[in-house]
Amino acid sequence: MKKLFGLFLLGTIFVLLMVRPVGAEQQLSVVYPPANHQTVADRIFLVGTAPPTGKVLVNGKPIERSRAGHFAPSFPLRVGENTFILQYQDRQVQLKVQRQDTTPAPPVGLAFGKDSLTPNVDIARMPGELVCFSAIAPPQSVVSVQLGKDNIRLLPQLQQAQLPANSALLTGRNQPTRQLTSGQYQGCTTLPELGNLVDGNNTITSGFTPSTGIQPQFQLTLNSQTVTQPSPGKVTILSPANLEVVEVTANEGVARTGASTDYSRLTPLPKGTQAAVTGKEGEWLRLDYGGWINSKETRIIPGAIPPRSLIRSVSARRVSGATEIVFPLQVPVPVSIQQGDRTLTLTLYNTTAQTDTIRFDDDPTISRLDWQQVTPDRLEYIFNLKSQQQWGYKLRYEGTSLVLTLRHSPKIQNSKFKIQNSKFQVSDFQLPCTGAQQCAPTDSPLAGIKILLDPGHGGKETGALGPTGYPEKDINLLISKLVREQLARRGAEVYLTREDDRDLSLPDRVDIIDKIEPAIAISLHYNALPDAGNAMKTKGLAAFWYHPQAHDLASFLHSYLVQKLNRPDYGLYWNNLALTRPASAPTILLELGFMINPYEFEWIVNPQAQQQLASAIAQGITQWFSNIEINS
């Protein structure tokens, strides 16, 4: 996993090594926190190692260590500089950790808080929409904002619930907190119709161009003194009769629930999708169906009117290993996909049906296609499926026709296994064939199955570091190769995204999955924590999924590995990760243990445990395929 303690923490940690001439057996090392690191967390853990004999002291007190001498104690942090002195015999490591105060600094004198005025980027909205403003000002101030001829009073907000980051779930600290917010002022207004908003001597009458927007003027009055400051962002009212139309230029336009990468993802929009723009916030565009997209993934279509389409007939065609359903449209419209148990629902926006005829012959995957006009401009197609397990889908536009590809069940070439698969079992850690033995057909329960393994990280991206400095990228690759060997002995056709220590971007890994189209894809990782976690007490195996088609695989493998290996259970998670998002195959990510936990790290680097883990993963995959109806 892209390590949380490297992502969620900012920082400056000053590390001073006071080295004395001692023997190699007296080495003391600290691998976390790194140099130049600061944090907003209220605690931090120190990960490192020293020879197992003797004691390691932190600020004069002995700390807990594993049998091999590894340690990862946590300590509270006060705001400001915190000093830790680690000592083993005559070697010392001094750490200075800076905890930042997240409370906004109150303004000094008659002034607004620094960078506190919002909107802080240009925004555009439709007439009648609610727009809100906020500022930080001295207590007892009278604060307002002038928007054209409208004056909006901003009122003090004495208490607000603060939500922690998503990563707080990983440490069990994800509950909202109530905070007194002295000096926080907020207020909202409904935007008027065009022609009713006056800016000086100008009446705002049209458009999306920022130059036609109004810059809100914030006013603060305290002790009979007044100061005025313009907002960093302008407000523009869009004309419903003159909306811009954009086309998605990315292969998969990233649609979100709001105007930043903090917001959740929606179904990606296929290249060529067209939609009207009904809102803007900085570089983000709100499309007419409700999703937001970064303007860098679009182009403006000059003179285009808001896209609307009719649809009449629908047809299906067989291709190798899949069924393609073709929806002839007048214009490429926004779409979304929702998977359920034995169903897949395709939604077409800005579309109205004139459908009398659909041809849909008997299909290996689909039992029936239903449809309904949910609203005058929103249409749903419900695919009723023959199997509960789905094997992947793709969306693309060919001209103005939408093509939905639904993959068929993989076919196991071992005919004997196809008959007996419901009874197939393997004992713990037993290999169907070993060494120079040739696998007979009955020894190849995964014959004909393509499986992709993704060893996480690589190259400059080390991933998490164990107490000795051993990088996650290396153990990810080692375990992936061991799993490949065991899957191949069971007859599977196994692919790795990388065979050696190299840089490989997340998009490149996703492209490999989409190109190979395996039956399943598994990204293999080891875990770490944000600073607020307890590295000494946290360990175990976790599985992550995103699309419903991957849930059963993630759930089964997670439970199987925890039980067969007698490992701690760190949980089953829905998570928006790059290597769980591919829709072309059931794709999951496994976190096989915590690199930063001193005790679990000893299990991670144990060669016998590595072989057992690889065997259990291969057996779990084999058992999962035997449990599902893949040849119905």
Regions found by a protein language model. Give the residues of each.
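Short linear recognition/processing motifs and adjacent strand/loop elements at protein termini
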Residues: 2-13, 18-35, 39-40, 53-55, ...
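Catalytic-site microenvironment of enzymes
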Residues: 24, 29-30, 312-322, 337-342, ...
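Aromatic-lined ligand-binding clefts that engage carbohydrates, nucleic acids, or primary amines
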Residues: 48-50
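Short, glycine/acidic-enriched capping/hinge loops at junctions between secondary-structure elements
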Residues: 59-60, 464
